[in-house]
Amino acid sequence: MPRPVTLFTGQWADLSLAELAPKVKSMGYDGVELACWGDHFEVDRALAEPDYVAKKWELLQKHGLSCFAVSNHLVGQAVCDLIDSRHKAILPPDVWGDGETEGVRKRASEKMKTTARAARKFFNARPGRASSDNSPAIVNGFTGSSIWHAVYAFPPTNQEFLDQGFSDFATRWVPILEVFEKENVNFALEVHPTEIAFDIASAHRALAAVQNHKRFGFNYDPSHLGYQGVDYVRFIREFGSRIFHLHMKDVWWGKGDGTVGVFGGHTDFADPRRFWDFRSLGRGDIDFEKIIVALNDIKYSGPLSVEWEDGRMDRIHGATESCEFVRKLDFAPNRAAFDAAFSRK
């Protein structure tokens, strides 16, 4: 049976979930990956209000939608980051506080623990959930990084300096992961520039830093790997059991006018000079056929969650065509050898 196709609501948080849900259904999706900003999934309210999660499910069911994950990228970013004025725009006021770096980090850490508890409560309330269902809930997100600014290794950067960054990540995230463990929730880091893991090598190093904590894995997204030159299909095979969730998202590279490189040239997305940019699914350079084959090989059975971004295209048009693209692309794996019928018993 093909995997459910869902839409990540993070880029749609200007709409209430009540406004967005019928649009998601009309675009052809089976469900949503709920962002923890806007009013889509408010973690504090989920814990404080007795009927909050039930009402969310009622709204989704009204429009024939399900949910398989929630995502709190924005708060997670602040756990390890070197905080500056940009963070104020993406953080809840109670996390930002006075903007002092260590205070922001600590409040972000507590909010991620709250996210785990809220996610567990939400998925426990899923309509039709069997009492014997002990499957982990999924929270996707970012970690931030105290060493991203050293990615180019100048001033000269030795491994001891980088080790300190991975140690800082472990110190801040292991206590969070312990709450995830207590709540039976998996945390899926979206491997992405600005995070502690942004390619295959750094993903291995991040896993090692948290001693392969069972609750730490990945939200696979090829769009953040391809333009870097990372083998995005190998990532699937390298981390198969740690891929808890994924984003279907496209990107092209090798474009532009030659004046802007892989670092972006301090240009905006959709600037025609850019070397790379995110595209609607099927319009970029990611080989999704190879991705589906690899996902079948590792027996990934979770949703195919479309994270739609394309600065050149209307989002309703783009998200609709992306849903159609994913549905045509996905297929169930073969359950028997194709040549089995040749043999006599």
Locations of regions flagged by a protein language model:
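Glycine-rich, proline-tolerant flexible connector loops at the mouths of alpha/beta enzymes
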Residues: 35-57, 61, 143-148
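Conserved beta-strand positions in the central sheet of alpha/beta enzyme cores
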Residues: 33, 69-71, 128, 140, ...
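Acidic/histidine-rich catalytic cores of soluble enzymes
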Residues: 4-5, 31-32, 70, 153-285, ...
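Active-site-proximal loop/turn and secondary-structure-junction residues that shape catalytic pockets
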Residues: 11-13, 36-38, 73-76, 143-147, ...
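Active-site acidic/histidine proton-transfer and metal-coordination neighborhood
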Residues: 14, 19, 23, 62, ...
